[in-house]
């Protein structure tokens, strides 16, 4: 796969549908790899007429791991801009989930000339609106078992975490969850990167005053049953961005199961269509 460069930081990315006239840049969440935007989902975007680009955030997947280095969300936003530059894209529709939603908010603030539309999914605009249930918070705070010492315990831990924060209306099978945990470990395993990414989230502080100044077609998508970033996060995001549309989805938690593909796609494509109408 190609790599973009932001100074010394290398960002792994993958592009689908390079012949399409407009691009959707997909940014994923805390500690998660680009594969959380499945190829099947990207193919659906291509079928709707868009080029789809997904990436590994710094400290995740096959991108640079920054041992002993600190950074902020603005740096991660600049990584995404480096990907657009490497892919030859001047402006894009941007969509992000969870921490990725925070990154696309930061992109819209810092790089408005690069943004055609914004879709913020299961995210929040400030630390005060980033709330979790105790069980979901444990997903972040309880370290996984050492996979080299007890592989089955590691897999069981990952599967249990996925069920804790997942969508109750769109459950995964045990076989699907096991396959995901195993595939993600085989691709890359970097727990310290999650710690640094969490610090970047908190360091970015309150984006609401800056979001108030945006002028970009925006759709905010959030699960009514999200335990990790509770609904106040989506509600506050939509309230912060002028003209934003809020879509609260029953049965949706904090993941992207196949049963939600159409809902995610419609949110992204609605924001993109509004950008075209305003052009």
Residue ranges and their predicted role:
Residues 214, 220-222:
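Short beta-strand/loop motif that positions the catalytic acidic residue
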Residues 117-149:
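Flexible "cap/lid" loop of the alpha/beta hydrolase fold
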Residues 59-95:
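Active-site loop/oxyanion-hole signature of alpha/beta-hydrolase fold enzymes
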Residues 244-279:
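Catalytic active-site module of serine/aspartate enzymes centered on a nucleophile-bearing elbow/loop
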Residues 91-130:
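Conserved hydrolase catalytic core segment
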